[in-house]
């Protein structure tokens, strides 16, 4: 879960321990490690490369885009750095990246956007505080009911099936049902897990442990962290990898400017890229791994960022709003980012089915127009023209093909283990979608990078960490 908008019972997870122990479960390579090519300069690839480089290995990173960071992308929006991909360090107390950010001297601030301050429906109008609090309770209880719903509906049920069954049993008024469902389905499930609800597996939703300590935002953007970790590395940009050939002698990685030989390759490209088949493997990946890749998928969280000259949304200050327009799932989540950005800024989040269809059919102008129309609905008044806007396209970007992984109906966390398993002791895999318990997050990508470096023999990652003061 990348966007942790819901207060849940806290389950401690000592991810920090992974910094010391990760890699122990995967057998060490039997071939000597002489040169490693890392495919992808996102958090997983940069972390692995940093650790290998610090340990004295020869390592080269090939990155398809003309920038590093991958799904971390801090953009200067009219003089203000805004994160268009990952924005939150989830669970400050358990998140290993908080220690890394501390050690590098970055400033991060608490940013728990759990509260929905405003909710409105195009049909029912605005909801009051009592109704919002009740809907929050109704939505939250769904997660406590998951074991019973799974027993009732079976292993092939989707989250949409679960939500239908849950609300069928609650004798709520139509108005309370509308808001309760929007709180659960739009605000939590489609913005956290972000895939269309009929595709999300009921069995595996909400099985990722919540990290303790609340969420934080890095002032100046997440990009700084990845830039800092990448310092001094041999990174080749605009190198689209198209083919990986491996045999007993080593690997050859083919990309835009030619071919590079190495003893090992680490692929950190998103599952969406592996599914698309734009990287050929010779010989083909084992049937079991290809089948796992086919079963897994990426979700579709997208953002529209609205920057204004003046701040005019007092009722949303440091908070969030939930919109139910007349189009199902259309841009439901509004988040005030003004204090973190240092300028009047709203981030509009949307995911699920709506994101898939809107990304395929609407242009940027239309997406901004929909975001502004829904903002007017939320505030109940007209709004000025933004001074700057930014629209993301993670879903259609050929180098991400979605936002982050989720477990679809018919898949299971074991598929991520299968994806992670090395092939022929030459081809290694890392990235957020290769470790279920921390999947869909930046710290998951980071830990996967640490893990693969350790598997290749790195004893110390050389990545500094310091406690919060
Ligand atoms: C909108 C959005 C919001 C998010 N919010 C949060 C959040 O608040 N908190 C959080 O923890 N996580 C969040 N995430 C998830 C987080 O961004 C990812 O889990 C994490 O950044 C993934 O890192 P990675 O290294 O595994 O993959 P990536 O960052 O995707 O890196 C893979 C790299 O491979 C490159 N690549 C792809 N194909 C090729 C090729 N053929 N040849 C060479 N290179 C290639 C890509 O360009 C990319 O740079 C969010 C993601 C999105 C999209």
Predicted regions and their residues:
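FAD-dinucleotide binding site
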Residues: 3-4, 12-16, 23-469
